[in-house]
A protein has these predicted regions:
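Carbohydrate transferase catalytic cores enriched for Leloir-type hexosyltransferases
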Residues: 1-389
């Protein structure tokens, strides 16, 4: 079987979509049933993928798309050029790493899309207006065109069922994100001689980075944490970057907060292993990849008590209530509490392993292929025996 995986997005650095696309490729090449995997990235993503991931597998071919990195050009590529590429590489299945506009009739093969969240509806501030309305249209169009929707968590499937019950019933299945980070791999230090907290998040409203900054600043002022402690924010710049920088300036945190766009997997492993606290105060998430990666590497995780984090983190995390009367003081209390206790041992993380997710994906792919063959055979039968003959 030949799989084509698309990752062409606006991201130029660390993002959940990029890591997800790479993990899909790793799952596919690990299976003997798969003969070829084609991973498609934008020209602006090429350096990040090569720097951050191991891409040497003989079954993996990386195709770099040289177009403008703007929404119109990317969407036009999916609509017009993806069908040509799929034919050129003789793909049996197309796996979209996130929802994009496609025309199923021009693709002539089964298409599956990974659904991470429903942010165009649940977190419109992530996109701004009127852009969010275009994202809603593209999401609906994609969900209507694809053959199957693999939701990255039960929480995401539940949100899909709330918004699009017919799609959830007919096409929705849960295939967790593959967490393909090896804590045993040799790691490289990024920071020396300073304790630090880590937050892995794109600069978007749902990540609640500004609360983390204010709480961190308050802990420093009140000397409830080591005054040398650094808060490292790892993630792509985005709609909230200007606000984040203004909070850093207003709280006089310039020497205590560091923004980083990208690191290699080896550097990321070191950060997870070495941080005093891994922070995730999000309002809403589809999965929570940094939490699972952090737990696999032994991080002490402090996060908001939201359904997705409970689903993936279980009892291994230190939770705080975003909506209690205590407000941000709840996060401060959770941080201080976590620092005084040993790291908790995470359980049931094998459900996110490459082996487990690869098996689940094979079930999805072969099911789609069998359905496609049956539909083709039915079509041929109708053609051979037209009504009234």
């Amino acid at each position: 079987m030949n799989i084509l995986i698309t990752a062409v997005s606006s991201s130029t650095g660390p993002s959940g979509i990029c890591r997800h696309a790479y993990s899909l490729a790793c799952c596919a090449v690990s299976r003997k049933e798969i003969s070829q995997v084609t991973l498609v990235v934008g020209k602006w993503q090429e350096s990040y993928f090569k720097h951050s991931f191991q891409m040497e597998d003989m079954k993996l071919s990386v195709v770099v798309v040289d177009i403008h990195n703007d929404a119109f050009a990317r969407n036009l590529w999916y609509l017009c050029e993806l069908p040509r590429l799929a034919n050129a590489v003789a793909a049996d299945i197309i796996h979209l790493s996130f929802p994009v506009p496609i025309r199923r009739a021009t693709l002539n093969r089964p298409v599956v899309v990974s659904l991470h969240d429903l942010y165009p509806y649940d977190e419109p501030d992530n996109f701004g207006f009127p852009k969010v309305y275009f994202n809603r249209v593209f999401l609906q169009q994609c969900l209507g065109e694809v053959d199957l929707v693999t939701c990255v968590s039960e929480t995401t499937l539940s949100r899909l069922n709330t918004r699009f019950p017919a799609v959830a019933k007919k096409k929705g299945v849960v295939v967790y994100n593959c967490v393909n980070i090896k804590s045993s791999r040799h790691s490289y230090s990024v920071i020396t001689d300073r304790p630090f907290f880590l937050m892995v998040a794109q600069h978007r409203a749902n990540k609640n980075i500004t609360m983390a900054l204010r709480v961190f600043g308050e802990l420093l002022k009140r000397e409830r944490i080591d005054r040398r402690t650094l808060l490292l924010l790892l993630g792509n710049h985005g709609p909230e970057t200007t606000t984040i920088k203004s909070v850093i300036e207003r709280e006089a945190l310039g020497d205590s907060v560091k923004l980083i766009d990208g690191v290699s997997d080896e550097e990321l492993i070191w950060l997870y292993k070495s941080c005093d606290i891994l922070l995730a105060p999000s309002f809403m998430e589809g999965f929570g990849l940094p939490i699972v990666e952090g737990l696999l590497c032994g991080s002490r995780v402090v996060c908001s008590d939201i359904p997705t984090f409970r689903e993936v983190g279980g009892e291994a995390c230190y939770y705080f209530d975003l909506y209690s009367d205590k407000g941000s003081s709840g996060l401060a209390t959770a941080i201080c509490d976590a620092l005084t206790k040993p790291k908790r041992k995470a359980e049931d993380l094998e459900r996110f392993s490459l082996e487990e997710i690869a098996r689940n994906l094979m079930t999805v792919y072969f099911g789609l292929q069998e359905n496609s063959i049956e539909e083709t055979n039915r079509g041929e039968t109708v053609a051979l025996h037209p009504a009234g003959s």
